[in-house]
Amino acid sequence: MEETEKMKAFIFDLDGVIVFTDKFHYQAWKKMADRMGIYFDEAINNRLRGVSRAESLEIILEKYEGEPLSAEKKAELMEEKNNTYRELLKTMTAADVTDQVRATLKKLHEAGFKLAIGSSSKNAKFILEKVELLDAFDAISDGNNITHSKPDPEVFLKAGEFLGEKPEDCVVVEDAYAGIDAAKAAEMEAVGIGDASRYEKADYKIQNFEELLKIAGIE
């Protein structure tokens, strides 16, 4: 995408880009793991970033030394984790989104760009409601409408589809390597922020959210 004129839409990962709920994920998984007698630390938690709840559980169960678990039991563990996580999410408020993020999204929207969320989380809408940011996005593609999580491109392709835009006209903003891989697999350009700002596959690398305005040709 050599010309900013081709950019018509921005698709944002949620966690680690718009909001930061890593600590809640960690606390919820750890509570479940501790109860099961499974070793779990922040290094293992880092492997869970950007992947689905089911895949996250399988990673955690690598340390499980008990009898093999049935699909039903695994589903119970995932529900247990999510219930704890949602309780923690209830503490979120509008203050959990920075003024810089809000202002940048507003400027992008006013400049005519369509905005979407592309997240593997099934709690995306709930989180956006809690931080009072649901109305900032034209579409939400999340864990409720996909069958494959990142690095599969499905979540971003669905977001583009919901926006009515072609993949080549969409730019993805991601903080995880798996998310950048998913964006490239979708044939979309990718902006790396946070950890992903060090990933060579990212087309753009930024340190601050407001740098998106330069990429969009607004500032």
Language-model-detected regions and their locations in the chain:
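Active-site neighborhood of HAD-like aspartate-dependent phosphohydrolases
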Residues: E2-N46
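Helix-loop "lid/cap" segments that line or gate small-molecule binding pockets
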Residues: M32-A33, A54-L69, I127, G160
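Short, acidic loop-to-helix structural element flanking the phosphoryl-transfer center
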Residues: K6, E87-I117
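Conserved SAM-binding loop
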Residues: I18, V97, I117, H148, ...
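An amphipathic alpha-helix signature
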Residues: Y26, K30, R53-E58, M78, ...
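Asp-based, Mg2+/Mn2+-dependent phosphohydrolase catalytic module
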Residues: E2-K8, R102, K106-K107, S121-E219
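Metal-dependent phosphoesterase signature
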Residues: Y39, L61-D99
